[in-house]
Amino acid sequence: MLDKLLQKFRDQKKPVFHKEEGYWEISALRKWAAILIIAFGAGIIYIVPYFAFFQFKTAVANVTGVEPNRISLLLTAYGIVSLLFYIPGGWLADRISAKALFSVSMFGTGIITFWYFLVGLKGIVWITPN
């Protein structure tokens, strides 16, 4: 029974997608590169805020002068604000292209990650008053 069903799908000559001319005509290497970039970016978007606060809480507290308990409170506030913006973000995703939203979010994540990097260099590279 399963073989007949699979054979029926194999014998169909209709394409699954009604493709526009040239839309699906990109090389396999470019497809895999795009998938890799999207997967890496999606992972980084969720990891950066939590990784910086959980893994480097003591280092961030020492560099910024903020108590570790306050950093935990900031992480809680980040989670609540993120939760509140999920619904408007979904509404926005229905009206703006996914490529534009992904580009903006990756740019913002890059700026925040670079800021984390600069915070970590405070006192090592820059001469700061005591």
Curated annotation (Swiss-Prot):
Entry superkingdom: Bacteria
Keyword Membrane: yes
Lineage: Bacteria, Bacillati, Mycoplasmatota, Mycoplasmoidales, Mycoplasmoidaceae
Species this chain originates from: Mycoplasma pneumoniae (strain ATCC 29342 / M129 / Subtype 1) (Mycoplasmoides pneumoniae)
Transmembrane segments: 34-54, 73-93, 107-127
Protein name (database record): Uncharacterized protein MPN_112
InterPro entries: MFS_trans_sf
Keywords linked to the UniProt accession: Cell membrane, Membrane, Transmembrane, Transmembrane helix
Chief place where the protein resides: membrane
One GO cellular component, as annotated: plasma membrane
Membrane topology: Multi-pass membrane protein
Disulfide bond annotation, renumbered to this chain: none
Subcellular location: Cell membrane
